[in-house]
Amino acid sequence: MTTPDVDGAARFLAGNARVLDRRRFERLFSGGDARPVRDAVAAFRNSDGGFGHALEPDGRTPASQPAAVAMALGTLDEADAWDEELVAGACDWLAANAPAEGGASFVEPTVEGWPRAPWWEAEEGRPASLFTTGQIASTLHARRVEHRWLDGATDLLWRRIDDLDDPGPYGFRGVLRFLQHVPDRGRAEQAFERGGRLLFDRDMVALDPDAEGEVHTPLDFAPNPDSIARRLFDEATIEAHLDHLAGGQADDGGWTFNWLAWSPVAASEWRGSLTVDALRTLRANGRL
């Protein structure tokens, strides 16, 4: 069993990661305070209450974007750096920029003209994204936030889940995040029992830890022992993927990713973010 080198990860982050992820590591693994994480997140905030400035490294526009809001709220939550002012502003921005059907788009048109990954293109009509909407709604429900945007997003997600057929792996990850924390637990369990097998029926998950390319693993869908989708995988499969994750630490101390590295800066920022994520997953599963 590979034992991750936490000190090596710390050195990698010190030499390669942005302040945000260095502060995340400090908070989560070195007993650091929550306030520096809050302040690091706030540095990406705009006057409209949303978040931008490449907080999500693949969209390098200064304008507020839903994916950046999702990352901001998730970071505040994980570090227990929850800030009512930042959260209220983000929710107000979401409400002011919601698609007609509710929720949040994946990419807003304000990305136009700025460096971005090839998949960061605003769709015509600004449809709601299961991925961003599910992530944001999940975090807000976990924190028991009440806001009109969340009410509309929850209704939208339930409608989409009731007719779920082929959401794609990212969309399904958003659905699972939502089902993890939405207050109506009975409905969430029923929805999961109906739709959980789509993970296999639509070939969204790679069960082989050595699968190559931009694949999604069981740990992407069920990173923690209490994840709603963990029951879909046997213990041997989870342990094999944990072994693979632990063994994925590079010689420089960091972890990397399996999608297109379209920008050296974005790649470095993603590696910093995902290094902290990898350590979190390994610790949650008893590997640290």
Regions found by a protein language model. Give the residues of each.
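Preference for long, amphipathic alpha-helical scaffolds in soluble/luminal domains
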Residues: 1-288
